[in-house]
Amino acid sequence: MMYSKIIGTGGYLPSRIVSNDELSQSMQTSDEWIYSRTGIRQRHLASPDESCSDMAFYAAKRALENAHIEADAIDLIIVATSTPEHIFPSTATVVQSRLSCQRAAAFDVQAACTGFMYALNTADCFIKSGQYQNVLVIGAEVFSRIVDWQDRNTAVLFGDGAGAVVLSASEEAGILGTILHADGSHKELLWVPQGIGSSETDFATRRPFIEMQGREVFKFAVRSLTHLVSELLVQCQMSADEIDFLIPHQANSRIIQAVAEHLNLPIEKVIITVNQHANTSAASVPLALDYGVQNGIIKRGDNLLLEAFGGGFTWGGCILTY
């Protein structure tokens, strides 16, 4: 049986770091208020001249270097993002050009914070079908551009960054199983209402920023993700004690804790970066994975459970052997 296996990871975070204390100087909040509710201490924010494709490119370069593979060996590039700098062309095509991946196909996917899981599954299917051998999968976001910095309920939650993996055909076990879900009936609980195709034409009434009903999102996320991880274990015919590390979407420490407790996983078996990165949306999971790999926490042969939840609602996850 042919598998798809992650052979390299990479990450990129903008150099500007904004602490909770710095945010408290421009809005009614505090480090204690933010940290106690989210687990976030700081976030990285893109500079004015830094774009989504810039960050995707830097993360991709590092993933290629760590995979010890040349750019011209890549068959396909998939970028998961909700914050591209262009309506078209896709961010993936911009990255393809900058990497000089001359023969690679390229496209974007959009599933909000679950985007990387959707992109990874798409890459996995392409490889298992035999169509492609090496796929570059990237999650990249500049959510600072769609956050209302006067709204403390959302502004404190998000950061910018990019994470990437090289997924390659392998006879060794890699991705063992994936489950994806969506429920569009709850779209208004977490969304950016204004889009280019919106029927709203009055600029004064446009709503171009993230709007969220936090309490409802939290309840739905915990319920959905705890059920999801149980589904994944059944699909892969595994028990929770066979999971070496949980790599969750880094949105909120309380959601992360709820999923870990459902799996009876000690916190030492959970990769947590939300305190340093905040919620980087589609970049969240690959950034956390890269953090674990680069710091020697995750090793070859470890069984990993990845999961994410985002606007839509969308949610999904996979179990893989690293």
Curated annotation (Swiss-Prot):
InterPro entries: ACP_syn_III_C, ACP_syn_III_N, FabH, Thiolase-like. One of its GO terms (molecular function) is beta-ketoacyl-acyl-carrier-protein synthase III activity. Pathway: Lipid metabolism; fatty acid biosynthesis. It is an enzyme of class 2 (transferase). It comes from the Bacteria. The keyword Nucleotide-binding does not apply. It catalyses: malonyl-[ACP] + acetyl-CoA + H(+) = 3-oxobutanoyl-[ACP] + CO2 + CoA. One of its GO terms (biological process) is fatty acid biosynthetic process. Keywords: Acyltransferase, Cytoplasm, Fatty acid biosynthesis, Fatty acid metabolism, Lipid biosynthesis, Lipid metabolism, Multifunctional enzyme, Transferase. Pfam families: ACP_syn_III, ACP_syn_III_C. GO terms for cellular component: cytoplasm. It is found in: Cytoplasm. Residues 250-254 are annotated as: ACP-binding. Its EC number is 2.3.1.180. The active site is at C113, H249, N279. Belongs to the thiolase-like superfamily. FabH family. The last Arg residue of the ACP-binding site is essential for the weak association between ACP/AcpP and FabH. Homodimer. Catalyzes the condensation reaction of fatty acid synthesis by the addition to an acyl acceptor of two carbons from malonyl-ACP. Catalyzes the first condensation reaction which initiates fatty acid synthesis and may therefore play a role in governing the total rate of fatty acid production. Possesses both acetoacetyl-ACP synthase and acetyl transacylase activities. Its substrate specificity determines the biosynthesis of branched-chain and/or straight-chain of fatty acids. NCBIfam families: fabH (TIGR00747), PRK09352.1 (NF006829). This is Beta-ketoacyl-[acyl-carrier-protein] synthase III. It comes from Dichelobacter nodosus (strain VCS1703A). The gene is fabH.
